[in-house]
């Protein structure tokens, strides 16, 4: 089993557990160049989105593939989710380790008022 397959297996297992809870989830995906975050409800509807691909976010950042970019995305997605009336979510790290950019995004979302 390669690295990607292992990550996807972990992600699937975590998603099934979150689905059983029936709560909104904050989904994170990272690539070497960008980071993406979405708040998705139990019916699989996307409620809020933020990523380093967005022009408004890109203009604020020097680089899109670092911890500072992840913090910016975390803050923005939390603000957009709270605007839509979502205050509590489950954190879906998509099988990525809770470290570096993933952890920075989560911490920034918490600081912006999202509870998980």
From Swiss-Prot:
The keyword Transcription does not apply. One of its GO terms (molecular function) is 5S rRNA binding. Pfam families: Ribosomal_L18p. One of its GO terms (biological process) is translation. SUPFAM superfamilies: Translational machinery components (SSF53137). One of its GO terms (cellular component) is cytosolic large ribosomal subunit. HAMAP family: Ribosomal_uL18_B. Part of the 50S ribosomal subunit; part of the 5S rRNA/L5/L18/L25 subcomplex. Contacts the 5S and 23S rRNAs. PANTHER family: 39S RIBOSOMAL PROTEIN L18, MITOCHONDRIAL, LARGE RIBOSOMAL SUBUNIT PROTEIN UL18M. This is Large ribosomal subunit protein uL18. It comes from Shewanella frigidimarina (strain NCIMB 400).
């Amino acid at each position: 089993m390669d690295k990607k397959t292992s990550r996807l297996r972990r992600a699937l297992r975590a998603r099934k557990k979150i689905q059983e809870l029936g709560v909104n989830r904050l989904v994170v995906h990272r690539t070497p160049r960008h980071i993406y975050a979405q708040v998705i409800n139990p019916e699989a509807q996307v409620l809020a989105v933020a990523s380093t691909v967005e022009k408004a976010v890109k203009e604020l950042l020097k680089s899109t593939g670092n911890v500072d970019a992840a913090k910016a995305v975390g803050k923005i997605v939390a603000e957009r989710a709270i605007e839509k009336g979502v205050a509590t979510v489950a954190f879906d790290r998509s099988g990525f380790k809770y470290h570096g950019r993933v952890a920075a995004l989560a911490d920034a979302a918490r600081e912006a008022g999202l509870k998980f």
